[in-house]
Amino acid sequence: MGKEGVTIRSARQEDLEAIVEIYNEAILKTVATFDTEPKTCDEQTVWFATHDAKNPLLVAELTGIVVGWASLSKWSDRCAYSDTAELSLYVRGDHQGKGIGRRLIEAVLDEGKKNGLHTILARITEGNDGSLHLHQSVGFTHIGTMREVGKKFGRRLDVHLLQKLYPTH
């Protein structure tokens, strides 16, 4: 098990329903994502399949229940971006603030580094201060703010762009 009974592991196909449920909670209740309509497992199957060793998808499991997930996804299909990924992190609302997000980020970043990534980017919506501080505490640097690029719940929202570089050997 891990600290506090939470296990961090690679996602399996049978985790997809829980992953989608957690993401849909964020869609409906937060500005953490700019998706506005809930997703289905069928819709997310292609996304799930894009993850591999270089672009991992990890879950946090507590007493057999998936309570959070983190992924590194290709930033772009253009070849020059092959060593760049975007970090996504979602934890069930009733499990936030318990260190699960930190454990997921640290684990997914370790996997990305081990598998040859150089640059990790994260987009964090204004007002999501907990996520902003969490990312900065694990080495992300704020590199810019995209002003009013999204609209959700009737508000125009800024998005902060953060970056973490792995040293080149």
Region locations from a protein language model:
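A structural signal for short, well-ordered beta-strand segments
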Residues: 87, 120-122, 162
